[in-house]
């Protein structure tokens, strides 16, 4: 439940902020503080605009990854892991929605809306924050809650059985 709630919440936050960016930043840049500004861009590639000619393949790959994460999401044992996977899935889906439906050229031909600009880092969006921070949290969750080793539990069972005889 937590995994799904985080994923849905992240998609909604991402799409609402992109809606705001598209409606408010068409011909404008808003300086927020220091080097942070909001500036509307469309990214037809992956991270850092790499692979701009492969938008359809990037979209298909993202859908496959989301499918795998949703499948694995049901078996997550920790709350932190559930939040992390929810952020990754929500972020990936937010960007896939842009690719799928923000295009005049056809399905999965659209560009991802990016608008958060620090001027010293590539422009990004809320979905990107979910994917990156979710991945970091997933690593932390994995380090804090390692999967039990099947050979360890089998070894404990057999040694306790041997000791009791």
Predicted regions and their residues:
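Alpha-helical transmembrane bundles and membrane-interface segments of multipass inner-membrane proteins
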Residues: 1-165
């Amino acid at each position: 439940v937590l995994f799904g709630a985080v994923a849905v919440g992240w998609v909604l936050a991402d799409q609402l902020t992109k809606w705001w960016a598209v409606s408010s930043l068409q011909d404008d840049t808003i300086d927020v503080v220091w080097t942070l500004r909001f500036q509307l861009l469309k990214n037809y590639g992956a991270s850092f605009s790499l692979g701009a000619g492969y938008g359809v393949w990037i979209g298909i790959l993202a859908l496959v990854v989301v499918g795998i994460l949703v499948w694995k999401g049901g078996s997550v044992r920790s709350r932190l892991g559930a939040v992390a996977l929810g952020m990754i899935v929500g972020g990936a889906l937010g960007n896939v929605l842009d690719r799928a439906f923000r295009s005049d050229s056809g399905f999965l031909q659209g560009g991802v809306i990016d608008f958060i600009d620090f001027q010293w880092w590539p422009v990004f969006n809320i979905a990107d924050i979910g994917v990156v921070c979710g991945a970091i949290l997933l690593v932390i969750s994995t380090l804090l809650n390692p999967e039990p080793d099947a050979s360890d539990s089998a070894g404990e069972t057999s040694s306790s059985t041997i000791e009791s005889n």
